[in-house]
Amino acid sequence: IVNCAECEPYITADYRRMLENPDELISGLKVVLQLFDNATGILAIEDNKSDCIQRLEELVQNEPRIKVVALQTKYPQGAERQLIYASTGRAINSSMLPADAGCVVDNVETLISIHRAVITGKPLMERVVTVSGDAVNEPGNFLVPLGMNQNELIEAAGGFKGEPEKIISGGPMMGFAMFTTDTPVTKTSSAILGFTED
């Protein structure tokens, strides 16, 4: 199952990847499917991303082992257990792992990285990060090298509109408050959000 849900508000990094790198996404999924003889690949996307659904359906129409599943847009649709249930109808409880339901869940950025590593020989050196929130001058998505200082990334987005009340790494629901942005972008950095109010 490819987690294309990206259900947290403000984060659009995977959305941009699906629009701009769909071939690499599908190629990465095909690499993973080679590891499992009888597996089916599911691109699980919330139904508010109709442009991605349409594009990915076009690209997999001749791929018998891959299908696109449109999911209801709701939080926390992208959480692993909810995603598995919504995509396959298989329920797993908190003591179970996805493998207990016969599933592997990967995200968009991971599969693109798999494609690049296996097909092109390029190691994981960059990722897309969303910089957004009402305290950000020019919100957007940025393809940046791992290790880049997050202050530089914020400057690339035009900086903050004054001193933000709160800065969050990740989404507003599952992310965490940052006390400093003088830290590097890592492979798990999906977003930097700046807000003027709590």
What are these regions (language model features)?
Residues 39-150, 156-163, 171:
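Hydrophobic alpha-helical positions that pack around
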